[in-house]
Amino acid sequence: MEAPRRRFFNCRPMLPGMVGALAGAIVAVKLGNPSLWLLGLWGVALGAFALVRRWEWFALPLFFGLLLLRGALTPTVEVPAGTYPISGTVINRPARRQLSTTAVLYPVYISGTRVPGALQLSVPAAARPAYGETLFCTVTLEEDPTVHCQGPFVVMYAGRARGGISTNPSRGEGFYGWSLAARERLEGVAGALFYPWDGPAKGILLGDKSDVDFLTYEAYRRSGLLHLLTVSGLHVGVAGAVILALIRGRRRWLRMALAWTLVALFCLLTGLAPSALRAAVMLLCFHLGLQLRRQDDGLSQLGCALILLLLLEPRYLLCNGFCLSFGCIYGLVCLSRPLSRLLPGGGQRRGSLLAGAFSVFFATAPLLSRVGGDLSWVGIPLSLLAIPLAPFLLVPGWAAMLLYPLLPQAARAVALVPRGVLLLLQSVATLAPWEGLSVPYCGDLPLILWYAGILLVSDLFLPNARRPAYLGWSVLFVALVLWMTALV
């Protein structure tokens, strides 16, 4: 009797679906051609046919085609460079320099006509518009601006304010307008509670780095702790765990619905960063799996989050935080177990923590090279110190900010714990030695090979703990050579 064939990949349909969605998003972003709809229809038809025939790889062409169709509907820049009167609502303040402040406006009206996308605007530092305010000014738009993401919105225009600036202090309408006003008030509360560390506190608790000075930003970056200044999966995970702990009870679906609502509110108040949205979707999939009594599968949760967010906006691939967030979890899912077997103490908790830190470092290294080119070895042990401290900053920090309008003195007492954690993180980031290296830019081919090698090294490929992953390590070695020699 013939032995049953083993699958090459121990996975669900989300793995080919994730590959198809990534490929479709890359093609859509690189080409940006409205005629992609024809190829997209072919992909969807092939995926539907494979689904009817119950072929396991049906998700690959299906989501590839859907992403092409979504890309064909993506708007392009419609306004040429020049000077125009503009108006828009301030939704983010990503940076502040000595002489200027950067503000992101959405929706944007240029010469009275609404245009797709958001506008990144440089205004004088004295102006400092508040969240939710409507800003009116004359702007000189740049030619060929770099398309990127700020929060959930795609920045398609960039410019500098000219002449006078006027603002309408009334916040936007609806629930989103309320959330912007609430975020502005929370930033004022954070400044009162956590001074002189209010800049890092606003970054860690609210995702606003506009008050983080250059020296502090560089200290966090060079020490490998920059991820703490951005609201990410760590923050959403802590928020979700605390919410579930506070609403214990027998009605599980009611608990989950309330937890999802509060996590969504948390993401809204922290700027709807793509990394936070990724964590929220994964948390939703995890809770649904628990309620439906399904086996926990990190790769399927990651694939579901990736597919949903790319269908929402394919140009999220241009967002560094989005890519680093997915790269981090991808490394944890694929590399934690293989590395825990190689490192000393692999069967113990400290070995698992060390394997997780190395997994994140290896998975995000090529992406970091495309952002700045510096890799910090110090970030590995410092992350082992900083991540366990994060709940002691996030939970009492948010509790103090929410308590401050009612009981200011009690809020200041609660804030003593996060102030101590902030002081410790600031000292560690400032005093930590710079032990790293500058690496060349990782091209597209080495990047693809690198992540393919990570998958082939993992237990998802021909799962067998006794089998050395020769193929995976070979692919990683080839990717490393191509990366370091900059041949491609």
Annotated model-derived regions:
Residues 1-79, 155-156, 174, 278, ...:
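N-terminal leader/targeting segments
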Residues 2-11, 151-282, 287-288, 438:
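Aromatic-rich juxtamembrane segments at the membrane interface
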Residues 16, 20, 55-60, 214-382, ...:
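Hydrophobic alpha-helical transmembrane segments in multi-pass membrane proteins
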Residues 81-97:
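Structural detector for short beta-strands of small beta-barrel domains
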Residues 87-90, 131-147:
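Flexible glycine-rich surface loops and low-complexity tracts that mediate binding to linear polymers
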Residues 95-106:
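Short aromatic-glycine-enriched beta-strand elements
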Residues 112-129:
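Beta-strand/loop nucleic-acid-binding surfaces
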Residues 169, 173-178, 184, 369-381, ...:
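Membrane-interface amphipathic/re-entrant loop segments adjacent to transmembrane helices
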